[in-house]
Amino acid sequence: MPRANLSHTAVVDAAARLADRDGAAAVTVSSVAREVGVKPASLYEHVAGLSALLDGAHVLALGELAAAVADAVAGLAGADALRAFADAHRAYATGHPGRWELLQRVASPSTVASSEAARVGSLTLATLRGYPVPDDQRVHAARFVGATINGYLALTRNDAFAHRVEPTDASWRAAVDALDRALATWPAERIHPSDPENTA
């Protein structure tokens, strides 16, 4: 890419491509500079440094994931929406492994405040509207869904299931079905360890 065509967007796109091809750990200022055909110093005209570069790629991945989830869940509700939501995450993780790695980074304040992050959060909460989860429990339910999906995908990525012959697709479907049942029977009140009646 000629230097004249460089922009913040082009640099971030290059970082995301590099992450998918070589892994998120391969993304450095020097490697991205090589990717776009300039010297590392030229990149600093467009990004403040490595952290800003990774943040940009993180936000890019959030935006792409949000778009994929929105398309998948459009017009669906309840279990159908949940399955589409989960499958969209799995497809993105499979199709963009490096970008998925970037999504597992601890989000910076600017990433958390981005419209892309807000959209992912809104889509998650919208998916939960098809279940009888009380308003004050929706954040907990969203964390539960996220932990289940991300945990399964992380284990798959690390070949944790490779030693068994049972198909991972069947395990995935069972996990999503279990999520559906848990959300459908989410209790109206939660008992926390600090509650007096639960400390006997």
What is each stretch, according to the model?
Residues 147-165, 180-189:
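Amphipathic C-terminal alpha-helical segment
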Residues 39-41:
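Key DNA-contact positions within bacterial/archaeal DNA-binding proteins
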Residues 30-34, 43:
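Append "Primarily bacterial transcriptional regulators
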Residues 1-6, 187-200:
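N-terminal intrinsically disordered/low-complexity leader segments
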Residues 70-101, 118-121, 135, 141-145:
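Hydrophobic alpha-helical connector segments
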Residues 8-16, 20, 25-26, 37, ...:
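An amphipathic alpha-helix adjacent to DNA-recognition modules
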Residues 90-111, 123, 154-162:
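Amphipathic alpha-helical segments used for helix-helix packing
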Residues 107-135, 139-144, 166-181:
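Amphipathic alpha-helical packing segments from all-alpha helical-bundle domains
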